């Protein structure tokens, strides 16, 4: 069916009265007609310095809303929108909406004209960027994105993707020539001592502006009515094609009403896969953003709950509660469609729990969900959950892992590389990938623009046999890339660099790219093969060199942005002088996924240390989620652990460790002092704060690159010594001599390199039973032996240690 996309006389007369050129109206009509005909989005960027740009957006968006209202029924008939979506939904996003703010004034200028033209069948939601969590899982017809002052790249990714096919996006921007050289609120957040705002770069904004001009489907006008980039030809009608029919299986276990909610064949496949879960099993679902993945999972969860024909508990988890709003919303819609009256529990405006007769869905953080008893476990945005936590759900009777491959929370092949490979060894499961977009048609130009500007689909370079030979021979060199060149000239190296992070790290956000682009203290390093290919990516932050006045403030609680390691050393180790020293904090280091475990990471650290030494720096350090693999990597590369966070990260389920390696003699004294202090603390923390820390991790935290024993006096009374003799001679039991055993075990862990040899199992036993005070039953499970065997083993270990340290205590 062909529809007219032409603003009526009333709109044209009003626009004329407001001095809007007819050519600008025609440009907007054309953009809307193109969007409707292709079921894509179109974007109109309005450059300007005054409220006029917001007024112009109000007129153009109001006129567009009026046209869309007139064809709503037709869009529903063509299955381009749900029957429940019977209003034109408009989103206005800005940096501030408080009284007397410029953001508020622009919003009011927009509404003044929009409300006159849009008609009554329209709903406008205004949000600040801080509250964009409120819109996740929702869909809009028109978006007005006010980027006049502040925005973060994360906001950009999240907001743009809420607009459906057939919709328009209006961007309020400064004149490009001015914007290129402006600092935004995001830039101000990057200032850290000793830097000032003048040191902040503007690479990201310049890239964004360039991408507006490069991509199709984006038109640029000025608030004065000049078209800087316009369609090749005008268009005032659109042939609206129906969404292709989706065949519903003749025989279904779930109610047909649920299948009727599916808009693509991919969604039908997901529902069929959920039917198979009735008998138990595991489903892995991947998709690019906007493919209806979370929607399908929400509908499927309700179908499964009904098919089980019993009281059903469903645990839903994801990195953040925001991630599962579409899932909850469509689960609720599915229940309503079947005649239920669901009860919703919200937290800060977000759905957290959903209940209907004998059915309950509840969100838990990833590190808590697996501990709950349930009939189905759903892990949405699973690529954002740390791999050890993903494994905790693997043995559940029914489990669904669902993940975005590309998108603002994407993880490339990382999810497959890091998790699925190991999961296949443990159990069979069904894999589904959803290709067909649901919110808009394929090849949407705005999606292409977004993926390009935010590097959401960046991939590392492909490696050949010749490359692996170079890797084997370590024919590599470390280089500081020219970030001006990378960002301004859109070098392939930038995509390869970011691509390594996307595949290797469990969580990537667009702001990471902007941080690299603009933060004055952030730099990149790459490990290249002799032929120039990037195999290891390093992002570093220059820290330290902090003025004395700021250090005094830090000691009293002030937290300077960006100086994570100096701040920790001042607050936790009272080493104010450390904040004066300069060093590199390694923010992220990752190796090409096809070249892992070949020593490239260690080689990169070796070369970075050499560079730091030549530049006269004092230290190199890093902070990371403490897994056994990572702590071992840093310790084996000569780094000393100086801090461990008291609580686990709710998403990764890991404690954060901070490690340091001294370069200067001044730094060596301070870092050794901090490392000694940390080891002393850890012997106590393991029985309290870190009682649940995995012993295989704790074991590596005690390792030291300094090789010396901690100067920590251990005192045993004569009676305690006699009782230790009695214990090792099988006269007394362990439980009666714990007070005497613990100091000896502490001595062992605080000792230097010249200490008695214990194997890995024995070390874990001492940590788990003595320092963490777990029961004999739990300890026996840890080493997969009987309790009696475990008791004998512990006695034997203590006998050897007591024999060694007895002489030292006499001395």
From Swiss-Prot:
tRNA processing as a keyword of this entry, yes or no, is: yes
User: Catalysed reaction per UniProt?
Assistant: cytidine(34) in elongator tRNA(Met) + acetyl-CoA + ATP + H2O = N(4)-acetylcytidine(34) in elongator tRNA(Met) + ADP + phosphate + CoA + H(+); a cytidine in RNA + acetyl-CoA + ATP + H2O = an N(4)-acetylcytidine in RNA + ADP + phosphate + CoA + H(+); a cytidine in tRNA + acetyl-CoA + ATP + H2O = an N(4)-acetylcytidine in tRNA + ADP + phosphate + CoA + H(+); a cytidine in mRNA + acetyl-CoA + ATP + H2O = an N(4)-acetylcytidine in mRNA + ADP + phosphate + CoA + H(+)
Q: Give the EC number(s) under which this enzyme is classified.
A: 2.3.1.193
Database matches in Pfam families: GNAT_acetyltr_2, NAT10_TcmA_helicase, TmcA_N
Give the GO molecular function terms. Answer: 18S rRNA cytidine N-acetyltransferase activity; ATP binding; mRNA N-acetyltransferase activity; rRNA binding; tRNA binding; tRNA N4-acetyltransferase activity
Subcellular localization(s) per the UniProt record: Cytoplasm
Q: What is its main location?
A: cytoplasm
Domain named N-acetyltransferase: which ranges? 473-662
Record GO biological process: rRNA acetylation involved in maturation of SSU-rRNA; tRNA acetylation; tRNA wobble cytosine modification
Name the domain of life this protein comes from. Archaea
Q: Which residues hold acetyl-CoA?
A: 589-591, 629, 636
Q: What does this protein do?
A: Catalyzes the formation of N(4)-acetylcytidine (ac(4)C) at the wobble position of tRNA(Met), by using acetyl-CoA as an acetyl donor and ATP (or GTP).
HAMAP family hit by this protein: tRNA_acetyltr_TmcA
Into which family does the record put it?
A: Belongs to the TmcA family.
Quote the protein name from its UniProt record.
tRNA(Met) cytidine acetyltransferase TmcA
- Native source organism of the sequence: Thermococcus sp. (strain AM4)
Source taxonomy: Archaea, Methanobacteriati, Methanobacteriota, Thermococci, Thermococcales
């Amino acid at each position: 069916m062909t529809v007219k996309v032409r603003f009526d006389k009333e709109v044209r007369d009003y626009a004329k009265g407001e001095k809007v050129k007819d050519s600008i109206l025609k440009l907007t009509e054309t953009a809307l007609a193109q969007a409707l005909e292709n079921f894509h989005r179109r974007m109109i960027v309005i450059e300007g310095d005054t409220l006029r740009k917001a007024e112009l957006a109000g007129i153009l968006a109001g006129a567009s809303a009026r046209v869309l209202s007139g064809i709503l029924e037709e869009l529903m008939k063509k299955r381009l929108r749900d029957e429940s979506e019977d209003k034109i939904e408009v989103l206005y996003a800005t940096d501030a909406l408080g009284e007397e703010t410029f953001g508020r004034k622009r919003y009011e200028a927009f509404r003044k004209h929009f409300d006159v033209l849009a008609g009554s069948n329209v709903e406008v939601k205004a949000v600040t960027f801080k509250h964009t969590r409120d819109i996740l899982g929702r869909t809009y017809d028109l978006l007005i994105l006010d980027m006049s002052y502040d925005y973060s790249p994360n906001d950009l990714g999240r907001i743009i993707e809420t607009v459906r096919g057939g919709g328009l996006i209006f961007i309020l921007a400064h004149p490009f020539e001015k914007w290129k050289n402006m600092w935004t609120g995001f830039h101000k957040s990057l200032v850290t001592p000793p830097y000032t705002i003048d040191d902040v770069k503007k690479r990201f904004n310049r890239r964004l502006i360039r991408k507006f001009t490069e991509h199709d489907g984006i038109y640029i006008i000025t608030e004065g009515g000049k078209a800087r980039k316009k369609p090749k030809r005008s268009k005032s009608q659109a042939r609206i094609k129906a969404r292709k029919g989706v065949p519903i299986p003749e025989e279904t276990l779930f109610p047909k009403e649920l299948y009727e909610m599916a808009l693509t064949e991919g969604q039908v496949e997901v529902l069929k896969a959920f039917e198979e879960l009735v008998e138990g099993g595991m489903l892995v679902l991947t998709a690019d953003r906007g493919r209806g993945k979370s929607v399908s999972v929400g509908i499927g969860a309700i179908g499964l709950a009904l098919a089980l024909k019993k009281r059903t508990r469903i645990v839903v988890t994801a990195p953040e509660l925001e991630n599962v709003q579409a899932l909850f919303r469509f689960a609720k819609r599915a229940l309503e469609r079947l005649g239920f009256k669901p009860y919703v529990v919200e937290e800060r405006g977000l759905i957290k729990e959903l209940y209907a007769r004998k059915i309950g869905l509840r969100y838990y953080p990833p590190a808590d969900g697996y501990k709950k008893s349930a009939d189905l476990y759903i892990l949405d945005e699973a690529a954002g959950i740390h791999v050890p936590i993903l494994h905790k759900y693997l043995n559940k009777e029914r489990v669904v892992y669902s993940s975005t491959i590309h998108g603002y929370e994407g993880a490339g092949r990382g999810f497959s590389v890091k998790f699925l490979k190991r999961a296949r060894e443990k159990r069979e499961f069904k894999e589904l990938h959803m290709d067909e977009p649901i919110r808009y048609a394929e090849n949407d130009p705005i999606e292409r623009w977004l993926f390009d500007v935010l590097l959401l689909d960046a991939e590392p370079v492909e490696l050949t046999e010749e490359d692996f030979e170079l890797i084997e021979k370590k024919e590599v060199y470390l280089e500081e890339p020219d970030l001006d060149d990378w960002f301004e000239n859109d070098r392939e190296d930038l995509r390869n660099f970011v691509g390594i992070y996307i595949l290797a790290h469990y969580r990537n956000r667009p702001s990471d790219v902007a941080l690299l682009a603009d933060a004055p203290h952030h730099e990149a390093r790459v490990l290249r093969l002799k032929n120039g290919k990037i195999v290891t990516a390093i992002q570093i932050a220059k820290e330290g060199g902090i003025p004395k006045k700021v250090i005094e403030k830090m000691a009293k609680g002030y937290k300077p942005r960006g100086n994570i390691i100096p701040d920790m050393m001042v607050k936790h180790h009272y080493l104010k002088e450390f904040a004066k020293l300069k060093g590199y904090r390694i923010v992220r280091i990752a190796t090409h996924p096809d070249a892992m475990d070949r020593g490239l990471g260690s080689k990169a650290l070796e070369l970075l240390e050499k560079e730091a030494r030549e530049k006269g720096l004092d230290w190199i350090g890093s902070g990371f989620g403490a897994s056994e693999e990572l702590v071992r990597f840093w310790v084996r590369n000569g780094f000393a652990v100086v801090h461990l966070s008291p609580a686990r990260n709710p998403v990764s389920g890991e404690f954060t460790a901070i490690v340091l390696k001294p370069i200067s003699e001044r730094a060596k004294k301070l870092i050794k002092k901090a490392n000694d202090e940390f080891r002393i603390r850890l012997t106590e923390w393991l029985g309290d704060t870190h009682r649940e820390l995995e012993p295989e991790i704790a074991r590596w935290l005690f390792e030291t690159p300094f090789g010396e024993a901690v100067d920590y006096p251990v005192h045993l009374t004569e009676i305690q010594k006699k009782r230790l003799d009695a214990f090792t001679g099988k006269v007394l039991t362990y439980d009666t001599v714990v007070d005497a055993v613990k100091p000896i075990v502490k001595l062992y862990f605080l000792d230097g390199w010249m200490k008695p040899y214990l194997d890995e199992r024995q070390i874990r036993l001492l940590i788990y039973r003595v320092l963490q005070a777990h029961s004999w039953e739990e300890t026996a499970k840890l080493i997969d032996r009987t309790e009696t065997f475990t008791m004998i083993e512990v006695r034997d270990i203590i006998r050897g240690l007591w024999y060694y340290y007895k002489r030292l205590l006499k001395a």
